[in-house]
């Protein structure tokens, strides 16, 4: 029995053929962003709950950030870290750094997740050349042996995409299980990231016109790929969740149609719904739940609210 063939056939049936032809698997971040500029330019792309930018504006803002990198001497293969919560700015950097030919590493930004000593070990271990931070991390970043920039730093002039291939490293996924004196992470190429983002398209339900809240941090590989890049692939509107403690207020306000969560968060959200009522989850059609074991009871609880909870 050819399991691979059967699996491919099963997943391909989840998307209409004419839609699938419009969403080929791209090899690099650069190719994905070019498609977004051409096909989604006027659609809303990213929102911080107050300001919303279109895909055309996102493309231009990423290009200006690339020029900032070039102007500050970064070259192909340099590793650049970002220490900041989910925001419009950190999302721009997550895509600007690889399209400049550099390698991005998103660091966990939860309180006390990264100490000064751990950050120093990280910089030395990975030979990090630059660090973008939110202002609240100034103390941790002070005195580090690396160029430090504010998360808002950018240029007024756009810069071109670098000459990258699918085999060039794009992202280092920092492991949360690191010991402070021996940090490590997985190095993922442009091609690997794009394959994973494309694989995320194959779910039941409609492909386009989705709204999501990026709740999982970009330092979480599942959150960065399925929670952001797959949504970018389909021209979805992505709300940046800057503070996870606010999701109880953000969900009914933003009315997302799809969420990417870990089981603990899914359980919490469903528990809140039992208290606040079904209206709390109004609009949500799908929850993709991964990163850890998901109990069958969560699937049933979600189904009771008319939500398709997909484990994987």
Language model: regions and residue ranges:
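Conserved pre-ATP/AMP-binding loop-to-beta segment of ANL
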Residues: 24, 156-177, 181-182, 205-211
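Conserved AMP-binding/adenylate-forming core of the ANL superfamily
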Residues: 21, 25, 34, 42-73, ...
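ANL superfamily adenylate-forming
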Residues: 130-168, 194, 272-273
